[in-house]
Design a protein with these regions (language model features):
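Active-site-adjacent scaffolding segments
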Residues: 2-118, 122-129
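Structured surface interface patches that mediate subunit assembly and partner/cofactor docking
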Residues: 2-19, 44, 73-80, 114-228
Length: 228
């Protein structure tokens, strides 16, 4: 009797359109929100990125996407030093110009990421997470959630499996089927998470989970962080 294909296994087949779809969904929600905010809101601190303001995060995101669109990946790109230079290059820009560049990047980077064979998929997930950071800084509801969450969770699951991350089975309020993350070779029993999708995203990206209700068994939160 052959092995049965589970829904979790199906996720391992890369959907090249998924990263671009995630960016487009987030663009359609985030850009109008940014354009409606007062200028001083762009100076608010972002708790998930110490030392960065909302504007810093947006400048980092727009610069990264512009690099993708223009295929500019010099040595050291996306290092902390490179990120700081990208932000500094935009110091003289208006907030509106940064938002315009971000909108263009979120629109045009998708096809480039789709054609990159998977090596840029994590960047799309990172952009979506940073959008959650901005929503969080604004006190907006739905940070690390919303319409893009299913695509973000599927991307997160595949990326953690490709990286051989610690195995975890997540029973999510937001999905009908359990989500399997991390390596599945059986070397260690999987941990288990019970809770909602935004909290799982926070755990995997090192964001604070203060006040969130969830269960995490068999693995420590610090072991989940894909950016750690």
């Amino acid at each position: 009797m052959g092995s049965m294909t589970t829904p979790a296994d199906v996720h391992d087949v890369r959907d090249p359109e998924q990263p671009g779809r995630l960016l487009a969904i987030e663009r359609d929600g985030l850009i109008p929100l940014l354009r409606a905010r007062a200028e001083e809101d762009f100076a608010l601190p972002v708790g998930a990125c110490p030392g960065w303001s909302v504007r810093s995060v947006l400048a980092h995101c727009s610069a990264a996407l512009t690099r993708v669109v223009e295929n500019r990946f010099e040595d050291g790109v996306f290092s902390p030093e490179s990120n700081d230079r990208d932000i500094a290059e935009r110091d003289g820009w208006s907030n509106a110009r940064v938002v315009d560049e971000l909108e263009r990047g979120m629109t045009e980077a998708g096809p480039v990421i789709a054609g990159a064979g998977g090596k840029l998929d994590g960047l799309a997930l990172g952009e979506w997470v940073h959008a959650g950071d901005v929503r969080d800084a604004f006190g907006e509801p739905g940070a690390y959630g919303g319409a893009g969450l299913p695509d973000a969770l599927a991307l997160l699951a595949r990326i953690t499996r490709e990286r051989g991350h610690v195995p975890l089975h997540a029973d999510l309020d937001d999905l009908d089927e359990p989500l399997r993350l991390g390596e599945s070779g059986g070397e260690r029993p999987p941990g288990r998470f019970i809770g909602d999708g935004p909290t799982l995203v926070r755990l995997y990206t090192g964001r604070p989970v203060d006040g969130a209700e969830f269960e995490l068994v068999g693995v420590e939160a610090k072991d989940l962080n894909i950016f750690g």
